[in-house]
């Protein structure tokens, strides 16, 4: 067979994932902290990028910059003709990125998606008055970022008053470093003695001293030991209590008959002992500051509109204010025209800066579209609560705003929405559908779980609902659900079975009678 060379002409199409397009996709799924860190790195590398201070006025503060009605689906007149992020990016791939972009903040984020600066006090008041946010009148940032001691600092302050020998303090310091956030000690005494070169008796003696520190229960190695330390501090660790603490697995199973036999007490005494146990803290270290926590900053703020609808706004605190300094580019370009290398570097910086600002603009528009559609779909939840949460999936939102499901998935990742009902992750609003028993509207799984939790919380000791009873009640309410699904939801919410709940409720009822 002879070998020969030949030419073949073939035409094909393929999608090329450019670095800029990959960057735009990554920006979509970044949360506020990740985006701030990424922009800080880009500003450090690119001399043409500037971050505008938050207190500096921008064009977004103009009077015509208003909130976004949820009924519009998050689209503006300017963005109505735009499609998906990917289509928009690919259609501009042949254009010069350095053209048509001013250093104006209006090109970074459109006016129609920015909230009024005058709304800030009202939004801040709403945010602080949310459940779990405390009293808005007494809000003080110092209560959250300063003034609180960690568990290790509190224990270290007690150390000089309890141990005088340097060797004992060394052992104590080692034990303090081995504590977890709950105050439990995860260190073997024999290994500790070998590691520190100390006698086993000294290690055990130091641990006994440390277990008398405040808060009571620290340096325990098991839950039973933690409770025993606290009972000893209350002078309540009698033989019956010791037997109860040593058999916590029976208490977890609500096997009160076996506990009465092991502890040698009657039912009345056992109820008193259980009431004493409930007063103890199983995790004594959690009441202390364990580190620096970052507050969750909502990306979207939803508030009631005067016409009865909802206003959806991007949170200005989560918006990166990035500008391109064209004046600096022009000035430097004049002095570097003779140097082709410097000019090429400046042109590349300008292209990267323009693409970044456009990507941030597109990111803001996309978040706005998705959030507005979620608010439109979950209007009943915002008005009535979790019981009216509708079943929703990514495809419904993607079809409504004419985007791909993957784009919606990236937008809802690690993004939060502040609503009159509280602060929620965007993914919270996407729940599976449970059919209706009467061929009506489907029910959200989250709303069904809420109904199950409410029914169990309202049951009495004489009328504890089994899983089959819950199924019957839900079917009467129009929810078609299987018993195994109810059991799965109940276990996911850490709710015990009806047998265990009946034992506990009867014991509590008898305790209340005494």
From Swiss-Prot:
Pfam families in alphabetical order: Sigma54_AID (PF00309), Sigma54_CBD (PF04963), Sigma54_DBD (PF04552)
Gene Ontology MF: a single term: nucleotidyltransferase activity
Single biological process term from Gene Ontology: DNA-templated transcription initiation
InterPro entries cross-referenced by the UniProt entry: RNA_pol_sigma_54, RNA_pol_sigma_54_core-bd, RNA_pol_sigma_54_DNA-bd, RpoN_core-bd_sf
Keywords tagged on the record: DNA-binding, DNA-directed RNA polymerase, Nitrogen fixation, Nucleotidyltransferase, Sigma factor, Transcription, Transcription regulation, Transferase
Region (Disordered): 57-83
Binding region for DNA: 393-412
A cellular-component GO term for this protein: DNA-directed RNA polymerase complex
Motif (RPON box): 482-490
Function per UniProt: Sigma factors are initiation factors that promote the attachment of RNA polymerase to specific initiation sites and are then released. This sigma factor is responsible for the expression of the nitrogen fixation genes (nif operon), glnA and dctA for dicarboxylate transport. The open complex (sigma-54 and core RNA polymerase) serves as the receptor for receipt of the melting signal from the remotely bound activator proteins NifA, NtrC, or DctD for the expression of the regulated proteins.
PANTHER family the UniProt entry points to: RNA POLYMERASE SIGMA-54 FACTOR
Family: Belongs to the sigma-54 factor family.
The name this protein goes by in its record: RNA polymerase sigma-54 factor
Organism: Rhizobium meliloti (strain 1021)
């Amino acid at each position: 067979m002879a070998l020969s060379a030949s030419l073949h002409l073939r035409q094909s199409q393929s999608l090329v994932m450019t670095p800029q397009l990959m960057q735009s996709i990554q920006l979509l799924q970044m949360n506020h902290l990740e985006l701030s860190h990424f922009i800080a790195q880009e500003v450090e590398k690119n001399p043409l990028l500037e971050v505008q201070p938050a207190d500096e006025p921008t064009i977004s503060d103009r009077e015509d910059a208003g909130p976004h009605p949820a009924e519009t689906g998050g689209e503006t007149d300017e963005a109505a003709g735009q499609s998906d992020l990917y289509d928009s990016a690919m259609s501009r791939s042949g254009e010069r990125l350095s053209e048509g972009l001013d250093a104006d903040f209006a090109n970074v984020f459109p006016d129609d998606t920015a909230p009024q600066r005058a709304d800030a006090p009202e939004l801040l008041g709403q945010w602080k008055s949310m459940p779990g946010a405390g009293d808005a009148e007494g809000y003080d940032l110092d209560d959250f970022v300063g003034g609180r001691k960690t568990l290790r600092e509190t224990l270290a302050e007690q150390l000089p008053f309890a141990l005088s020998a340097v060797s004992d303090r060394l052992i104590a310091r080692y034990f303090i470093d081995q504590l977890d956030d709950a105050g439990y000690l995860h260190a073997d005494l024999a290994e500790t003695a070998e590691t520190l070169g100390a006698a086993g008796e000294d290690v055990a003696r130091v641990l006994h001293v440390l277990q008398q520190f405040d808060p009571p229960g620290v340096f325990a190695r098991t839950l039973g030991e933690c409770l025993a330390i606290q009972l000893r501090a209350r002078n309540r660790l009698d033989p019956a209590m010791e037997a109860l603490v040593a058999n916590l697995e029976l208490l977890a199973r609500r096997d009160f008959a076996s506990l009465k036999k092991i502890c040698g007490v009657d039912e009345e005494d056992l109820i008193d002992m259980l009431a004493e146990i409930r007063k103890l803290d199983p995790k004594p270290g959690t009441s202390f500051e364990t580190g620096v926590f970052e507050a969750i900053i909502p990306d979207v703020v939803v508030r009631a509109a005067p016409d009865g609808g909802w206003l959806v706004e991007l949170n200005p605190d989560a918006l990166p204010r990035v500008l391109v300094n064209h004046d600096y580019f022009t000035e430097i370009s004049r002095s570097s025209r003779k140097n082709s290398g410097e000019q090429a570097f400046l042109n590349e910086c300008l292209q990267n800066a323009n693409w970044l600002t456009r990507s941030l603009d597109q990111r803001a528009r996309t978040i706005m579209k998705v959030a507005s559609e979620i608010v439109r779909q979950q209007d009943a939840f915002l008005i009535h609560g979790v019981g009216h949460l509708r079943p929703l999936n990514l495809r419904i939102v993607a079809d409504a705003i004419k985007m791909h499901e993957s784009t919606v998935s990236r937008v809802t990742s690690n993004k939060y929405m502040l609503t009159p009902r509280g602060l929620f992750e965007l993914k919270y609003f996407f729940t599976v559908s449970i059919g209706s028993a009467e061929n009506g509207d489907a029910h959200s799984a989250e709303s069904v779980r809420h109904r199950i939790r409410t029914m169990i919380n309202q049951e009495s000791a004489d009328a504890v609902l089994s899983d089959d009873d819950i199924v019957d009640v839900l079917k009467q309410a129009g929810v078609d659900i299987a018993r195994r699904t109810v059991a799965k939801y109940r276990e996911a919410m850490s709710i015990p079975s009806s047998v265990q709940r009946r034992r506990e409720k009867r014991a509590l009822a008898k305790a209340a009678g005494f």
